[in-house]
Amino acid sequence: MLFRSPSLIVQHRDRPGVIAQVTDILADRGVNICNFSLSRRQKGGEAVMTIEMDGGLDEILAARIRALPAVLLCVMLLP
């Protein structure tokens, strides 16, 4: 996959509300999501979010997402 926009790869536990927690952090900073995907192998296991955005990605934002209890890994990709 080629990332043309600032992006996050977020590995997390598959639990209710995790997507909302991550997207709330983005919304609080005024970040617009231009592409989003989620994949998992089994219900309740681990999942991976791929989020492309229209700018606004920085280390402070990524650190807030990393601090969420269900997040296992958060990687920033800058074009």
Describe the function of each predicted region.
Residues M1-P79:
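A conserved regulatory-domain signal marking ACT and ACT-like small-molecule sensing domains
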